[in-house]
Amino acid sequence: LDQSSRYADLSLDEDTLIRNGKHVLVAYIMKPKAGYDYLATAAHFAAESSTGTNVNVCTTDDFTKSVDALVYYIDPDNEEMKIAYPTLLFDRNITDGRGMMCSFLTLAIGNNQGMGDVEYGKIYDFYLPPAFLRLYDGPSVNVEDMWRILGRGTTNGGLVVGTIIKPKLGLQPKPFGEACYSFWQGGDFIKNDEPQGNQVFCQMNECIPEVVKAMRACVKETGSSKLFSANITADDPEEMIARGKYIMSQFGPLSENCAFLVDGYVAGGTAVTCCRRNFPKQFLHYHRAGHGSVTSPQTQRGYTAFVHTKISRVIGASGIHVGTMSFGKMEGDASDKNIAYMLQDDEADGPYYRQEWQGMKETTPIISGGMNALRLPAFFENLGHSNVILTAGGGSFGHKDGPKIGAISCRQGEEAWKQWKAGQFGNISLSDGVIEYAKTHEEIKGAFLTFQKDADQIYPGWKEKLGYTGESSVQAASFDWAKRASAAAFVGASVAPAKKENVVARQALDQSSRYADLSLDEDTLIRNGKHVLVAYIMKPKAGYDYLATAAHFAAESSTGTNVNVCTTDDFTKSVDALVYYIDPDNEEMKIAYPTLLFDRNITDGRGMMCSFLTLAIGNNQGMGDVEYGKIYDFYLPPAFLRLYDGPSVNVEDMWRILGRGTTNGGLVVGTIIKPKLGLQPKPFGEACYSFWQGGDFIKNDEPQGNQVFCQMNECIPEVVKAMRACVKETGSSKLFSANITADDPEEMIARGKYIMSQFGPLSENCAFLVDGYVAGGTAVTCCRRNFPKQFLHYHRAGHGSVTSPQTQRGYTAFVHTKISRVIGASGIHVGTMSFGKMEGDASDKNIAYMLQDDEADGPYYRQEWQGMKETTPIISGGMNALRLPAFFENLGHSNVILTAGGGSFGHKDGPKIGAISCRQGEEAWKQWKAGQFGNISLSDGVIEYAKTHEEIKGAFLTFQKDADQIYPGWKEKLGYTGESSVQAASFDWAKRASAAAFVGASVAPAKKENVVARQALDQSSRYADLSLDEDTLIRNGKHVLVAYIMKPKAGYDYLATAAHFAAESSTGTNVNVCTTDDFTKSVDALVYYIDPDNEEMKIAYPTLLFDRNITDGRGMMCSFLTLAIGNNQGMGDVEYGKIYDFYLPPAFLRLYDGPSVNVEDMWRILGRGTTNGGLVVGTIIKPKLGLQPKPFGEACYSFWQGGDFIKNDEPQGNQVFCQMNECIPEVVKAMRACVKETGSSKLFSANITADDPEEMIARGKYIMSQFGPLSENCAFLVDGYVAGGTAVTCCRRNFPKQFLHYHRAGHGSVTSPQTQRGYTAFVHTKISRVIGASGIHVGTMSFGKMEGDASDKNIAYMLQDDEADGPYYRQEWQGMKETTPIISGGMNALRLPAFFENLGHSKVILTAGGGSFGHKDGPKIGAISCRQGEEAWKQWKAGQFGNISLSDGVIEYAKTHEEIKGAFLTFQKDADQIYPGWKEKLGYTGESSVQAASFDWAKRA
C-alpha cells in the first residue's frame, strides 16, 4: 500500500515538533529501490518503524494512529528523510520507568533495515526532547573525576596521557604488570585493550594483582595517582558483575582509580547499562570496537559514527573512543571534532539537529589509533582543546627510549601546543613551534627521532632545525625484562630468558612475515582443533598490497601493533592470528585465531561471544588501509564450541506443549499482534483471544513491552486470560512470546519473573523475546541463564545495518544467525528467503540448515555441532497462506515457526480464519508433496486443495496480488469472478464483547466518538470547572488540592493551558482516544481556580488517581509527585509551573506513615521529659571530609564533653580514608567515655545513604551492631533529596525505632526562588513530614549563612503543629507526629537568641559546626556557649533583665558566663552586627579578632 496518507505529514513544522517535545526526531539518508516513489517508500519506512503493517488489519483503532511515526520532511534529490516518532511509542523499564536505548534502536533501525523497497537507509542524526532525554541516566562519572583523582581540579584538567599495553594480546600476567609499571613511571592511564580480560594464558585472577602491585609502587615512587581501565565485558551480565566485584576487591582503596571497560558495540547497550547501574562510581570506558561494521562511510545502513557516539552519552558512557579525526591511523576526518562537541558540550549542533543536554554529564572523547607526541599538537589545534583521554600504544611503548619517556613525550606534545597557542614562540607555524619546544625537551625530541615518517610529513625540515644528521630510522628501546627485575618487589616480576630479542625497526612494517603463513593447511588446522577459522571478503585500499594488508588485518585482530613495541616476547607470538589463505582476485582472506586468544568467564570458564566478535570484527573495521572487510563464515573447533551453552529449549519443546511429539511437528502457526504498537491492554488481550481461536503462537513485536499506554502489569494479565479461555475452548495449548528486552539486565530479570508469576502453571507456554541485535548478546545470555527453561526468542531487528548485502562490513546474515545458535537462542528470525517482503534469497535456506542440522556446510566451512541443540528458524515479513507452500518446498520441510501478522489479521474473515488458512498452506504443500493431486505443479496443487477449504480460499480472495503472482489463472480455476480486492474483516471491539468473560473486555458506550483531528485541543471543557468551591472540596475529602504559580508561554490562553496542565497531570492525552469512558472522566484532575494576573492556579486531584502499594495499600509520595510535577514540567505551552502548597484530605493523609520517632524521643534519652525539652545542641564534625577514624572519634569525644548531638555530614559514610568499619567503633568508644564522664546521654546521627537500598540496610544493621545497647542513641541520616523519597522510606520501614534524620542537600536545585519549576522549600519540608522524616534541615530563616527569610518560620510551624497554615491551605495533621526542624549553616551562640525570638520557641535541633569547633576555647566550650544562647533568650523572655532589648539582655547574661562571652570574642563580626556597643558593655579592649583554639590531637588523647 501507499501509506503516505497515514504515515507522512509534510505540513509538520520541525521547530513546532521540537517545542512540543512529544516526538523523537530522526534524520536519515534513504534511497528507495529503482521504480519506487520516494514519499511512498518513506511512509512505508515510517510504518515499518512504528505501527504499520503491509496490509490493513482489523485491529487498528484511533489510538493506534495517534502513535504513528510520521515522515515530516523529504528531499529526494539529496536522499534526505526525517521521521518524527511519538515518545509514547518507546518501551520503558517496568522497574523504574526509565528509557531504553534498545527500544529506540529497535524502532529507528529495526525492521526497516531489511525492507524490500529500500535500497538503503542510515541514521545521520537524531533529536531527543527534554522530557524524553531525562528518562535516560547519562554518565555518572567522567573525565572530571579522573582529573580530580590526578590532582588537577575538575575543569580544564587537560590531556590524560594513557596507553594500551602492547601487544594487545600475548603478554602473561607478570610481564603485563611490568609493562604497567614501566609506563606509569611517566603516564597517567592504562587500559586493557578491547579483547583482553581472562584469557587462559593471562587469567584475571593472576593479572589484576600484578596491575595493583604496579600501581601501588608507581603511586609511591612518583607521588602521582595512576588510573587503570579493566575490561569486564562478557556475554553474561552476571559474569560482568562478578568481574567488576573481583577487580574492586583487588584494588580496594584504589578502586576509584579503576575504570571498567565495556566493548559496547559487540556486547550491546545492555552490557553498558549493566556496568553503569552495578558500578555507578566507576568510569565507564565504552570501547566501540566493531562499530565500523555499521558506521563506516562505505555503507549506507545503520547509523553513522556521530550517531553511535551520541547514543553513548545518552546511555551513560563516561568516555568513548572517537577515532583520531584524520590525525591517526584510523578512518576519520578533521570535521569529526563535531562528535567531540556533541559528547562534551551542553548544547551542540549535529548534522541536522541541535541537542540540548540539559546538564547531563559529558562523555569524554578517548583518542587512539596511531597517535604519538608528534601527531597530538595538530589534533588539539583542530579540536580547540586538549580535554581528552589518550590511549597511545605505539606512541609510548614504541618510543625509542621506552614507555616512560614515550608517555612524557605525549604530555610534552600537549604542552608544546599550549605554549605555541599562548604565543610564546612568536608568530610562527604550529609545526615550527613544536620544533622550538623540542629543542629543550629531550623526550619529545626523541619522538622525532623515533617516528621519523610522521616527522617528515608534519614537520618539514625538522632534521635541519633540530640539528639531526643521523640515520633515517632509529630503533625502539629494548624493554629488557631482566633489567626490569629491579621492579620485582613491586610487580612480582620474573626475569625473562636472556636470549630474547625484540629490538626491531620502527617504521610502518609489512607484517606478513609474522602474521601470515600461507603454507598452513586448512584441513590440518581443523584436525588440530586449536584455532577458530574465519573467512572474510576483504579489499585493501588503492595502492596497498593484499598480503601485507591481510597481515595487518590479522595483527590488528590479535597481538599486533602499528610499530614494534618493547614488550613482545616469544609467548606473545605463539598466540598471533595468522592469515593462512588469500585470493586477491576474489577478495577472499582466511585467518586462523588461536583459541587461547579468546576471553573466558571468570565464574565458570565458559566462552564469550563478545570476545570472538571483538577480535574478528573489532578494530579491523576502521583500518586506514582496508576498504572493507566482512565475515562470510567461521568455524569453531569441537573443544572450543563446547565452551558455549547453545540452546536449552527449542521448537521440540513447543511441539511437545502443542501435543505433537518432539520430531517433525511441523509449522507452528503464529502471529504478531497488529498494529505492533498502539493497542491498549484490553484490545491487545482481545486480539490474542481472536487469533488463538485458530492459531498456536503469538509474539510481542520487538518494540512492545511496557509502554505507558500498554503497561506490562495490565497487558500480561489480559494475555493470560485470553490464553486460558482459548485453551479451554479449543482444547489445544497456546504459546506466547513476551518481550523482556531492556537496557538493564536487572530490569530484564524483573520482567521475566513478573511474567512467569502471571502465567503460573502456564509458564512453559510462555517464551521470552529478546531484541538480540539492538540489546546485544549480553541480553541474550542474561535471558538464557536466568530463564533456562523458557524458549528464547531472538529477534534480530536492526541486523540489516550490518548484514545487508549492500555493505561489505561486519558479517553476513548467515554469520549472524550461526552466532545465535552458539550463544543459545531457541529460535531466531531468518527472513523469508525471497518468499516474503524482506530482503533475501532462496539460497538462504542454508541459514536454516546451519541452525537445525547437526552438521552443515556454510559458504566456506563445514560445522559439526556435536549434538548442540538446534535453533529454530522463525519466519515473518509479508507471509501468508499463499506464500507458504513455495517456501516449504524451497526449504524442504515445514519445521519452522511462523509469525504472520498480516497473514492472519489481514485475512478478510479475521485472525482466526487467517491462522487456519496458514495451517492449510502447510497441509496443501504436504498433500501435493505426497502426490495426492497427481502430477501437477505446486501452484495447481494448492488451488486444488483450496477448492475444498474455505479458509485458504479466503486467502486467495484477500491477498489477490500474491495470488496473481504465484498462482496464475487462480480466478478461473476457483471460479472467482468478483472484485479485484477484498477488505479485511472489521475487528469490531464491541462485537468482541462475547470474549468479555475471558479477557475482561467491556463494551464501549455507543455514544463514544473517538475519531478526531490530530491537533492540540482546548481541554478546558473537561479539565476545568471554576464553579467548584474550595471549602466544599475540602469538606468532601475526595481530592488532593495543589496550588501552583503557573505561566503559559506567549500566545497561549491561561485557562486552556491550565486545563492542559491538569490533563497532562492526570488522564489526558493530546488527542481524544477510543478508550475514554465515564469512569476515566471521574478521575480527571480539575482546575478549580485561576488568577492569571498573579499567575495562580489551583488543581483538584481525585485521591483515586494516586498509586498505592501492592503490599499494604499505603500511599506513595512518588505517585503524588509524578502527577503533580511530572510530565507537566516539560510541556510545550507552559513557561513554568511550581507547587507553592498542597492539601491532603484526612482519609488520604492516613495512608502515609508519618514520623515514627522525633525530638520527643531525643529529649527522653537526654533526660528532659517529652515536652518542651528545648534545644538539642549538636554539631557537624569539621572538616566534613578528611578526618581519619581516630581523629574523627577524638573530635566526637571533645564535642560531647559539652554538647548533645553529632551528625555525620551528608557526604560522610564510608570513604576509603575513613571506612565505616574503622570509624564507627571509634565513635562508639567516644560516646561511651563521654556518657560515663559527663553523666549525660549523647546522640549520634550516622549517614546510611546509598544508591542501593540493600546497601542502606546493610549499613544500618552494621551500625546498630556496633552501638549495641546504645542503639537508641543513634539516628540514621539519609540524604533525602539526592537519594530520593525511596531512600527515606527504606530507612523508616527497616529501622522504625531510629530517629530518621532527613538531610536536604541539593534541594535548592528545585526549591530556590530563582526558579519557577518543581516546588518550593515549604512544599519540600511539608512532604518530609508526610513521608516520615523525624527531623529535617530547614535553613536558618535569615539568621545564618543560608538563603532564607524570617517568614520561613511557617515551615517550622507546618512541621511541628497539629494544624498549620501554608501559603494557600490550612493542613490538619490529625495527630500525625511532628517532624523536628534542624538548623545549621553559620549558627553560633550569638545568632541563636534572635532566631528563637523569631520562631517563638527553641524546640529545634542545632548542628553548628563552626559555632562549636570554631570557638576560641574549643568545641566543648563552643557547645556550652550555644546552650547558654538559649538560656539567655529564655531569661530575657521571662523579664529577668528588665525592660531592655534582646541584644542587651544577652550581653547582661554574658557578663556572668564565660563561655558565651568567649563567643563574643571569637565571632566578633557577628557581635558587631547583632550587639552594637558590646565591647564597651563587656569591657573588652583587646584585638579585633581572636583565633580559634588550636585543636591539638595529641593533647586530646
Curated annotation (Swiss-Prot):
It is an enzyme of class 4 (lyase). Substrate binds at residues 111, 168, 288, 321, 368, 619, 676, 796, 829, 876, 1127, 1184, 1304, 1337, 1384. One of its GO terms (molecular function) is monooxygenase activity. Binds 1 Mg(2+) ion per subunit. The record marks K329, K837, K1345 as: Transition state stabilizer. The modification N6-carboxylysine is found at K191, K699, K1207. PROSITE patterns: RUBISCO_LARGE. It comes from the Eukaryota. Its EC number is 4.1.1.39. NCBIfam families: PRK13475.1. RuBisCO catalyzes two reactions: the carboxylation of D-ribulose 1,5-bisphosphate, the primary event in carbon dioxide fixation, as well as the oxidative fragmentation of the pentose substrate. Both reactions occur simultaneously and in competition at the same active site. This is Ribulose bisphosphate carboxylase.
